[in-house]
């Protein structure tokens, strides 16, 4: 929670670029997750905000609860709510992981499934 976002962002970017993805795609994922556009992101990087502050300032997307699975050996759904910053960090890392692995953007940016029944 006290790690500086600006120190981790280049690591995310480097990982994605090695896998043929772009800074724009990384920023798109982060914007979907946090509501921060590229200018907001650059300002936060320049400010050297902590992850705690980063997520406190964010407008977390309502569909982040749909992000499930294992990241860095931790199952996201099992992270206790009291560790909210850690949970948000792992959720965002999961999206970045999926991007690095070549998953399509429309699958990464979660949407609620609606059951449409014709009567």
Indicate residue ranges for each PLM-predicted region.
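A charge-rich, low-complexity, intrinsically flexible signal that marks solvent-exposed coils, linkers
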Residues: 1-119
């Amino acid at each position: 929670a006290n790690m500086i976002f600006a120190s981790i962002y280049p690591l995310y970017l480097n990982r994605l670029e090695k896998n043929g993805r772009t800074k724009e795609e990384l920023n798109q994922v982060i914007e979907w997750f946090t509501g921060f556009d590229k200018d907001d992101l650059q300002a936060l990087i320049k400010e050297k905000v902590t992850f705690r502050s980063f997520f406190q300032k964010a407008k977390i997307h309502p569909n982040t609860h749909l992000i499930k699975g294992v990241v860095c050996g931790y199952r996201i759904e099992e992270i206790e709510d009291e560790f909210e910053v850690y949970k948000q960090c792992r959720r965002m890392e999961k999206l970045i992981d999926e991007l690095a692995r070549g998953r399509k953007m429309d699958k990464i940016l979660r949407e609620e499934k609606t059951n449409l029944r014709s009567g």
